[in-house]
């Protein structure tokens, strides 16, 4: 009766893993040979592990990754991709986040930049760092709506709090003057905070996409570039075959399709 009441109280206190482990100990006579401290340690460990797993799931869910299942272990290092595995593994330690550096993933569409970015984001979540993934067109829309609704400061503050911001489709299209200022606000708000940029364009081509007017000598382009380029690791994600095509061929072979 006392044991049942104990399990009910553990469940009421939302210590479900501890309650389950306690029930297992009651069922198995072998646990009777263990000391009180050891059995208590096993109960606490079970509850700790459950809460850490739930916390990790929450961090990953809140990050809103395009590829939530992406992992550093799942990155493919085909020769034509020219990826430096040692460098990727160093990124996975999140030291660049601790030091406030950025990462620029450059490459053609379909070369797997998004997967790598989400994999590094997942690695950061596993170290319980707050991560946010967003496509640049969606971010620009969000900032525009926030400015119209008078909540721009609140939105900027929310992005400022993230340990890592992943901006996919960076400069996928040229920016309007207002959008350029908005991006400067984001970059400035994240001073000394890390960002990952996924882009199809070399960094020297960013100026004309931030400010498409060839007659303009806007300081905004220079301000954005200065806050990113000089503090970033640039990684080329190459490949003669796109990862979408590569995955399609692999699926066809595994499904009994024609060997290509």
What spans do the regions from the language model cover?
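Interdomain "pre-motor" coupling segment immediately N-terminal to P-loop NTPase/helicase cores
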Residues: 16-68
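Conserved P-loop
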Residues: 83-161, 207, 254
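Short, well-ordered alpha-helix to beta-strand connector turns
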Residues: 162-163, 232
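Extended interfacial segments that mediate partner engagement and assembly in macromolecular machines
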Residues: 53-106
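Conserved phosphate/pyrophosphate-binding and hydrolysis machinery centered on Walker-type P-loop NTPases
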Residues: 12, 29-34, 65, 77-81, ...
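Charged, compositionally biased N-terminal leader segments and the immediate start
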Residues: 1-19
């Amino acid at each position: 009766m006392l044991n049942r009441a104990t399990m009910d109280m553990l469940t009421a206190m939302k210590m479900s893993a501890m309650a389950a482990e306690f029930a297992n100990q009651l069922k198995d006579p072998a646990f009777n040979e263990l000391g009180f401290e050891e059995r208590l340690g096993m109960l606490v460990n079970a509850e700790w592990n459950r809460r850490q797993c739930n916390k990790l799931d929450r961090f990953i869910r809140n990050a809103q990754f395009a590829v939530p299942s992406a992992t550093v272990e799942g990155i493919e290092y085909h020769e034509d991709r020219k990826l430096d595995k040692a460098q990727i593994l160093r990124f996975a330690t999140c030291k660049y986040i601790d030091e406030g550096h950025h990462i620029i993933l450059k490459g053609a569409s379909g070369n797997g930049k998004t997967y790598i970015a989400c994999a590094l984001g997942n690695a950061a979540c596993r170290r319980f760092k707050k991560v946010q993934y967003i496509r640049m067109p969606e971010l620009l829309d969000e900032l525009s709506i926030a400015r119209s609704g008078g909540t721009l400061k609140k939105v900027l503050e929310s992005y400022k709090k993230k340990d890592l911001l992943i901006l996919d489709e960076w400069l996928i299209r040229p920016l309007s003057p207002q959008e350029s200022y908005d991006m400067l606000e984001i970059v400035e708000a994240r001073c000394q905070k890390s960002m990952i940029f996924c882009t199809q364009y070399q960094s020297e081509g960013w100026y004309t996409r931030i400010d498409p007017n060839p007659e303009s000598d806007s300081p905004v382009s220079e301000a954005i570039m200065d806050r990113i380029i000089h503090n970033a690791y640039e990684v080329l994600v190459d490949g003669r075959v796109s990862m979408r095509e590569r995955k399609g061929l692999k699926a066809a072979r595994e499904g009994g399709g024609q060997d290509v």
